């Protein structure tokens, strides 16, 4: 049995959402609106759990959890947490559904693998690697405070993202993983230019070639 985390799948699935979502126009964005747009999953606070006949103590210490109720999936989240924490927690649980994790095995030997994959999925949605690396190429120093203020994430999420990206070389990614790189940079160009304007001279030949490539995407 393969218990190794499937980072490639989590990365590609997150990229697919970034490309097709109309909810994500900039960063930060509403995790609840994204979940509603991309699925039939309902987001509800812990405070509304009683309405569904669920005891809040069943959640233990989790910040969010996903339940099957009446044939539908519901993400319950702890509304007392800070907004960045709630956002990440909701996307983490959303990741379980998108990555088609077997919930019957969530508490078994696959638990750790599932958690790592969904954390990676949520981080890529909230702080896309392609955008961070492009900002870095433009001369901006990437640190925890920058990620927190730019993407609306918690200090913990920002620090973990920096740690993860420091261990990865984007040049080693497969063609499937790189498929949406240019699309994502093009789609969120306004956000990029607002956060870190490109100071390099405009290259008409390069831009023409890029536009021809984009035209082939549609």
Regions found by a protein language model. Give the residues of each.
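Active-site hotspot residues in diverse enzymes, especially metal/ion-binding acidic/histidine motifs
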Residues: 1-218
């Amino acid at each position: 049995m393969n218990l190794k985390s499937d980072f490639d799948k989590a990365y590609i699935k997150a990229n697919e959402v970034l490309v097709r979502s109309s909810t994500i126009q900039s960063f930060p964005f509403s995790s609840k609106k994204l979940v509603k747009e991309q699925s039939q999953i309902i987001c509800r606070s812990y405070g509304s759990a009683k309405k569904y006949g669920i005891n809040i103590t069943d959640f233990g210490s989790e910040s969010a959890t996903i339940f099957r109720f009446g044939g539908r999936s519901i993400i319950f989240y702890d509304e007392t947490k800070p907004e960045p924490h709630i956002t990440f927690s909701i996307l983490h649980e959303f990741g379980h559904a998108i990555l088609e994790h077997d919930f019957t095995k969530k508490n078994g030997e696959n638990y750790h693998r599932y958690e790592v994959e969904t954390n990676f999925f949520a981080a890529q949605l909230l702080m896309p690697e392609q955008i961070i690396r492009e900002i870095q190429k433009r001369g901006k120093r990437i640190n925890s405070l920058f990620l927190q203020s730019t993407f609306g994430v918690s200090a913990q999420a920002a620090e973990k993202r920096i740690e993860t990206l420091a261990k990865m070389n984007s040049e080693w990614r497969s063609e499937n993983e790189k498929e949406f790189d240019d699309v994502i940079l093009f789609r969120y160009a306004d956000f990029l230019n607002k956060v870190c304007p490109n100071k390099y001279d405009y290259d008409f030949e390069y831009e023409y070639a890029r536009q021809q490539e984009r035209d082939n995407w549609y």
